From Swiss-Prot:
GO molecular function, one term: DNA-binding transcription factor activity
Domain (HTH gntR-type): residue spans on this chain: 7-75
UniProt keyword annotations, A-Z: Cytoplasm, DNA-binding, Repressor, Transcription, Transcription regulation
Protein localization: Cytoplasm
Gene (UniProt): exuR
Protein name as annotated: Exu regulon transcriptional regulator
A Pfam family per the record: FCD
Amino acid sequence: MALTESRRLYQQLAAELKQRIENGVYPVGDKLPAERNISEEMNVSRTVVREAIIMLEVEGYVEVRKGSGIHVISNQQRHLLAANGSDADFLTAGPFELLQARQLIESNIAEFAATQVTRQDIIQLMEIQENARQEDRFRDSEWDLKFHVQVALATQNSAMATIVEKMWSQRIHNPYWRKLHEHIDDKSIESWCEDHDQILKALIRKDPYAAKLAMWQHLENTKQMLFRATTDDFEFNVDRYMFAENPVVHLDHITNGKL
């Protein structure tokens, strides 16, 4: 199957899989082929396959059952998605596209914040972390959002905070991210608070390289957790569609173990 660039790859793949389901190639009650096989047949990455499957889940065609596979539960779309207004592009973006964008942008924001952060910024970040720990759950916590926005505010540039808040809010409004998030357990989410501690420590030291690495690693951990939570058929070493190695990822060589 040759996928063109007129639409996002995961949308093209989802359309092909939906057509097969509707035509009875994959009947209701059966399972889709393993993600590995879909990836090889369609000549796309595993990330693209995962996003396409999430889209099919949201629209009601399939159900992903951990340890069991991808089950076809309907041969017609059950849920219609509305993507209107200024956020339409965000609403149709794949969850891993959004995560990659956040990783690239927020790691650089954290780096700059370390050069501009004030004592008051540090106090506010410490208070946010304290409040986060007092909650009985960290899933969709307001303190998670506040932490990321406060890091951006520490740049002393309000536009940075607006960008971060708008991107972060897609975790609530993007239907594909919400579906993906349902598969994550609360214990895994608690590790995000520990990641925030590492970012805060770097900001306290006013170490831009360490702050950039800590934010990058935080979102890298999130990506790995999301993959582990939603598939039994994933080998990151063979997936170079997104999060491929580039100069940003090599910060660990620059910091020489400062974190």
